[in-house]
Amino acid sequence: MTAWSLHELWKTSHSTLFQVTLATVLMAPVLGDCGPPPSLPFASPISQLDEVSFPPGAVLKYTCHHGFKRTNSSHITCDENGSWVYTTFCARKRCKNPGELVNGKIEILSDLLVGLNIEFSCSEGYLLIGSATSRCEVQGKGVNWSDSLPECVIATCEPPPVINNGKHSGREEDLYTYGSMVIYSCDPSYTLFGNASIVCTVVNKTVGVWSPHPPACEKIVCHQPQIPKGELVPGFRHFHTYKDALEIRCKKGFALRGNSVIHCEANGEWFPSVPTCEPNGCIDIPDISYASWDGNRFPLENTAVFEIGTKLKYRCKPGYRANVHDVQIVTCQENLTWSSPSGCERVCCPTPNMEKIKIVSERRDFTGTCVYAYGDYVFYICSEGTYPMTTDGRSSCQADGKWDPAIPSCEADPSLQNHFALTFPNISETNVTNRTYLLENENATESFIKAVCPKPEIINGNLSVEKEIYAEMENITIQCDSGYDLVGSSNIICLENRTWYPDIPFCIMEGPEDCEIVNKGRQLLQCLSSPEDVQRALEVYKLSLEIERLEQQREKRTSVHRKAHYTKVDGPFRPFS
């Protein structure tokens, strides 16, 4: 090969050849050499090398790091491309099997090679005493585990908690091992809330605790619910305890609104809420003034419930009549209300013709719209100069709107111009002369006489007006002393026949203290020893009352027919013969 000087090369005319030659000269030392040897994770060169460039084919020997062992030829070679070529020739050493962990387990994450960890854990209910991990590491010329096997010991709990108003089934022990269970119970009349049993468990794999929390014993009372128109199953009890159940039923005519079964809850309340019994028909019988219910087998009650479509018939009380001619019926309608009744109106009696009669006394009910209504009565006399009446001077307004007896018309008497005679039918003159009369207005031009009545003798009572004699048509009121009851009318009037009407009442003691003062059979049952005696006594008493009533009627008929004519005189009174 001919050597060329650089000057000569520049002078050549072959520029292309020059460029190729120059590149070859410059690249010759780079393409064939290897750089410094690589730093391997498992091995390093046997000796320290100072060279930074190695020719192709150069071989370097390596030695394995601690914890690794040689598995193949431990050298690297520089190839023609200037790269170090090698295969993995060192492998990690392996620690021995750690063995078996009693009541636990060992978790090998990947292998037992150097640098790797294993983990320890205990079985449920056991606590780990020692390290939870161990690492395979180099120790001297070999490898071993960084930590020895731990120990798994069974967990323990303190004695179970004591609760108020209750107890548990555990024995008197200082410690309870994992899995131990105790059962709680409450004292009588107390209810257990929570879990009755608790168990010794482990928390965070470090400590033994009782789980769940112990229960509590409380006294829970639910009061007996009050459900109008409802019935309870089971029957009546003042109190109910937790979780007691009640079934509610409604009485006939009422429908249940709500749940039929309720339970006593921990807060002392019923759940669901207590239902109600609502009417399933019409209630509250219509209040029809002056009417009574008719055609019903049993007395009607406001508390009864009537089904839809029920018809009730009513009738007006004596002295009243229907406002209209409609049927006197009310009906229970679909909306659970009664149809509107037509009602009753008062029956009125006509006002007496006052032209020739004079009303001297009356009893009237001034609260109504009638001048005279059913039950009212009047006392009357004929005006002066007219015929005397043929009745007893008293008439009552009846339920049909008529007076009974009918009020007569008094006719003028032409024979009585300047006087009128005094006569008593069916009474002898001798008897007449023995009667007492009162001369009215003795000094007047026209004088009249009136019959007088003697003072009534009321034992244990008093009169509204105290006098020895009372004039005809004069009213008095009788009132009994304290502790006595009035038998008869409290108001009486003096009639022209010198008798009191109605009969003079009397006062009797309110209640007998013993059998000696029993009045007319009152408290008779206390005085007789057998029912037969009582029956006979009542029959005798009834018979005596009938006799007394007949005598009074006979006396009344006799007094009614005693009528008198009075003589107009100019001086002292004298009866005509």
UniProtKB/Swiss-Prot annotation:
The yes or no answer to whether the keyword Cytoplasm is present is: no
Q: Which UniProt keywords apply?
A: Cytoplasmic vesicle, Disulfide bond, Fertilization, Glycoprotein, Repeat, Signal, Sushi
Tissue and organ expression note: Testis specific.
Keyword Disulfide bond set for record: yes
Cystines in this chain: 34-78, 64-90, 95-136, 122-152, 157-200, 186-217, 222-264, 250-277, 282-332, 316-344, 349-397, 382-410, 453-494, 480-507
- Localization, UniProt: Cytoplasmic vesicle, Secretory vesicle, Acrosome lumen
The domain of life for this entry's organism is Eukaryota
Q: What is this protein's record name? A: Zona pellucida sperm-binding protein 3 receptor
UniProt source species: Rattus norvegicus
As recorded in Swiss-Prot or TrEMBL, the protein's gene is named Zp3r
